[in-house]
Amino acid sequence: MATNLRKTHPMMKIINNLVIDLPSPSNISAWWNFGSLLATCLALQIITGIFLAMHYSPDISMAFSSIAHITRDVQYGWLIRNMHANGASLFFMCIYLHIGRGIYYGSYLYKETWNTGIILLLLVMATAFVGYVLPWGQMSFWGATVITNLLSAIPYIGNTLVQWIWGGFSVDNATLTRFFTFHFLLPFAITGLTAVHLLFLHETGSNNPTGLNSNTDKIPFHPYFSYKDLLGLILMLTFLLTLTLFSPYLLGDPDNFTPANPLSTPPHIKPEWYFLFAYAILRSIPNKLGGVLALLFSILILFLMPTLHTSKQRTASFRPLTQILFWSLVADLLVLTWIGGQPVEDPFIIIGQVASTFYFLILLLLMPAAGMIENKMLNLK
C-alpha cells in the first residue's frame, strides 16, 4: 500500500495537522472564522508593506513626497498604498470581533492562547501606531508627538525616556527612521507569535458556542471549515476592495494630506478610528499619569478575564444577564470611539467620563457579579 505523503513527509505532516486533518468541533459558527481572516490580513499587510518599502524614503525631507510618488508614479502604487492603509482598518475590525467572540464564548479560559493573543494585540497596536507616523503628514507628526509625550508622565525617568525614543529633543528625522525600522520589523515578530498562538490553541482544540467538551463530536477541518473560511475570506476581500476602490480615504484624516509642520498644530489631534476608544479613556481623566494608566489598563484588563470568570458555565450563550452586560460593553465601546473623535468640550467630556467608568465597571465588577447571580439562580454550587 502506498504511503500518504501528506501524513508522512516531515513538512507536509505539520501543515496536514494544522489545516487538513485538524479535529474541529462540528458546531463552531462563523464567529470562529476570524482567526484565518486575521492570518490573511497579516499576509496581505506584509506583502503590500514590502512593496511600499521598496519605494518609500524614511527621511523627513522626502517621506511625504515619496508617498505622493508611490500614489502617482509607481505602477498600481495607489492600489498598494490604499490596500495597505485600509487593510490595517480591516485588521483591527477582525481583531476586535475575534476578541469579542473570545469574551462572549469564554475562550479566555484557554489561558496560554488568550495571553499570547493579548500580546499579539499589543504588537499589532504598536505596529499600527509607528506605521501611522510614516507618511509624515500633519496628523502623523502630531499624533507621534502627543502619544510618545505621554511617557513623560512616568515619574523620574519620563523625560529621559521620551527623548531616548525621539532620538533628540523633538519628533525628528531620527524618530522617523526608527519608527520605519520598527514598522518593518514588528510584523515578522507578530508572525512568529501567531505560530505560538496556534501552537497553544491546538494543544486544547477549539472552544465551541455551547462551551461543552466537544471531543465526542469532532470533524476534520478540511473540507468543512476550509470552505467555510474561504467564504469569509471572499466576503472580507470584497469589503476591502470595495472600500479601497470606491472610498479609499473614508477612514483616514484629511490633515494627513498636509505635510508635517512642527510650527502649526491641527485643531483636533486624534489617532486612527481603531484607537479612539482608548484615546477617549485617556482623555477622560484630567491627570496626565492617571490618564496614561487608564489607557494602559484599558487593554491590560484583558489579562484579568480568566481570573474574573465566576460562572460555572463557560459561554454566555445560556446566561441572559451576562449577555445584556456584554452587549452593553459593545455599545459602550462604540460610544467611547465616537467620543474619542470629538473635541474636548461639554457635553463630550462628561459622556467620555461616564463611558470610561462603565467600561471598567462592566468588566471588573458587573460581569463577575452576574456570573455569581446566574450560578445562584441555577442552583449551581
From Swiss-Prot:
CDD domains: cytochrome_b_C (cd00290), Cytochrome_b_N (cd00284). Its cofactor is heme b. Keywords: Electron transport, Heme, Iron, Membrane, Metal-binding, Mitochondrion, Mitochondrion inner membrane, Respiratory chain, Transmembrane, Transmembrane helix, Transport, Ubiquinone. Coiled coil: none annotated. PROSITE patterns: CYTB_CTER, CYTB_NTER. The cytochrome bc1 complex contains 3 respiratory subunits (MT-CYB, CYC1 and UQCRFS1), 2 core proteins (UQCRC1 and UQCRC2) and probably 6 low-molecular weight proteins. This is Cytochrome b.
